[in-house]
């Protein structure tokens, strides 16, 4: 029975409303490992699946989860109820390329000046 309290049932809600899981994860599981699970279990029929952990953001209880933290760090009192499943929202962000990082056009062209007379 002690094992139940050391695990958390998590389902991952994708942007289209479909889910991955639920699946049990030990309290010591890092957020980075959760993201690896999302990548490995991403539905094959869905386009634009994530390729790396950096492309995946997990949100739980309104907080963006940090890769280095564990499931235990984000556990809520509600998750201790029998049969409780925690839903984490999955956001995919495409990696930013070097071309996108560079500002477009001449920086002087984007200035705005106001004068009151």
Swiss-Prot record:
Residues 8-74 form the Ubiquitin-like domain. It is found in: Cell membrane. It holds the Pfam family Rad60-SLD_2. A lipid is attached at residue 112 (S-palmitoyl cysteine). This is Membrane-anchored ubiquitin-fold protein 1. Keywords: Cell membrane, Lipoprotein, Membrane, Methylation, Palmitate, Prenylation. Its main location: membrane. SUPFAM superfamilies: Ubiquitin-like. Residues 115-117 form a propeptide. One of its GO terms (cellular component) is plasma membrane. A lipid is attached at residue 114 (S-farnesyl cysteine). It is a lipid-anchor. May serve as docking site to facilitate the association of other proteins to the plasma membrane. The modification Cysteine methyl ester is found at residue 114. Heat stable and remains soluble at temperatures exceeding 90 degrees Celsius. It comes from Arabidopsis thaliana.
């Amino acid at each position: 029975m002690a094992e139940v309290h050391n695990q958390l049932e998590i389902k991952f809600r994708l942007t289209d409303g479909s889910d991955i899981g639920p699946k049990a994860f030990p309290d010591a599981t890092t957020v980075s490992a959760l993201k690896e699970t999302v990548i490995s279990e991403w539905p094959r029929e869905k386009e634009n699946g994530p390729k790396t952990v950096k492309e995946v953001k997990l949100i739980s209880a309104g907080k963006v989860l940090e890769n280095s933290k564990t499931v235990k760090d984000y556990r809520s009192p509600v998750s201790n109820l029998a049969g409780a499943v925690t839903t984490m929202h999955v956001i995919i962000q495409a990696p930013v390329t070097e071309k996108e990082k560079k500002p477009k056009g001449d920086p002087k062209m984007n200035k705005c000046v106001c004068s009151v007379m």
